């Protein structure tokens, strides 16, 4: 990815807002704008840092993943697990995150962690899969090569939930609905069970909560829809880390858009539904 910055081509916005930033301006920027506006002491790293610098994850009290964070290496996953087990809290303010396994390999010039390719998923291997489906053919520079599917651990065992859709795409929109109003997550929001934050869910989401994780709680849940037709059931979760730390999974890419709308920012829309912009309840939940 020697040229990683380009127009975000997915039709999430009719007016493209990435401005050559990849996905930073649509998703990460509203989050960082809000965090710094409120004086949080934050540092910034890339996926390459998460892959190559596990010790760096231990410098902070919390690790935050934002927006559309779909592509991870196996080492990124293991480093995040080790950080969690060392007492670092994790927050996944995104949807369809930690889905595709992408090894990081050196470039032809020998620069480490410079080439990526999608080889598999952070999902259980399907029980019934043909030998042909186990192999993918790719073009790499001028040569073709086969490789076995590189399946990672279940992403839900890290995040608390993961993509869970029959079509395997995890797309859909909806309202983000409170399930446990007396949970500390909702302190100061005034939300009651069944209260919803309209159009906060989109355009991809998480479900399949890993109920075996310690202290696992589904704090918000509801239906994801496309054109008003149910396509799945999302679940936002909180579970306990081993050292009084926590792991939160917001289950929606659009979470950061509920925090702030920086100058020039355009709210995302998909499937005929537009995210509503900043919401005091989203802000309070994130403070909590």
Where on the chain are the PLM-derived regions?
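Loop/turn elements at helix/coil->beta-strand transitions in domains of secreted/extracellular proteins
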Residues: 37-43, 58-62, 85-90, 214-215, ...
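Solvent-exposed loop/turn segments at secondary-structure junctions
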Residues: 49-52, 68-72, 96-100, 106, ...
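Extracellular ligand-binding/catalytic regions of CAZymes and related secreted enzymes
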Residues: 1-18, 38, 102-118, 168-288
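Short alpha-beta junction capping motif
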Residues: 57-105
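Aromatic-Pro/Gly-enriched surface loop or interdomain linker
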Residues: 1-56
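Acidic, Ser/Thr-rich peripheral helices and adjacent loops at domain boundaries
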Residues: 108-139
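Conserved anion/nucleotide-ligand pocket segment
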Residues: 134-191
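The substrate-binding groove and active-site-proximal loops of carbohydrate-active enzymes
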Residues: 14-24, 59-73, 271-279
């Amino acid at each position: 990815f020697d040229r990683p910055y380009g127009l975000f081509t997915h039709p999430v916005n009719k007016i493209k807002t990435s401005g050559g930033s990849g996905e930073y301006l649509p998703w990460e920027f509203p989050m960082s704008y809000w965090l710094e506006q409120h004086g949080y002491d934050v540092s910034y790293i890339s996926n390459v840092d998460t892959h190559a610098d596990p010790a760096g994850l231990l410098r902070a009290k919390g690790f935050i993943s934002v927006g559309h964070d779909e592509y991870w290496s196996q080492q990124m996953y293991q480093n995040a697990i080790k950080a969690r087990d060392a007492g670092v809290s994790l927050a996944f303010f995104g949807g369809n995150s930690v889905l595709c396994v992408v090894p990081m390999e050196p470039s032809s010039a020998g620069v480490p962690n410079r080439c990526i390719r999608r080889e598999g998923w952070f999902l259980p291997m399907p029980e019934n899969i043909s030998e042909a489906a186990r192999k993918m053919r790719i073009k790499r520079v001028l040569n073709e090569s086969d490789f076995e599917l590189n399946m990672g651990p279940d992403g839900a065992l890290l995040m608390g939930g993961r993509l869970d859709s029959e079509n395997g795409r995890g797309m859909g929109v909806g309202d983000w609905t409170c399930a446990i109003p007396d949970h500390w997550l909702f302190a100061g929001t005034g939300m009651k069970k069944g209260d919803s934050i309209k159009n906060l869910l989109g355009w991809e989401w998480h479900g399949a909560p890993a109920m075996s994780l310690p202290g696992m709680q589904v704090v918000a849940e509801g239906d994801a829809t496309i054109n008003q037709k149910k396509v799945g059931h999302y679940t936002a979760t909180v579970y306990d880390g081993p050292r009084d730390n926590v792991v939160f999974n917001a289950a929606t890419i659009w979470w950061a858009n509920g925090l702030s709308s920086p100058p020039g920012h355009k709210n995302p829309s998909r499937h005929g539904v537009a995210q509503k912009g900043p919401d005091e309840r989203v802000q309070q939940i994130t403070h909590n």
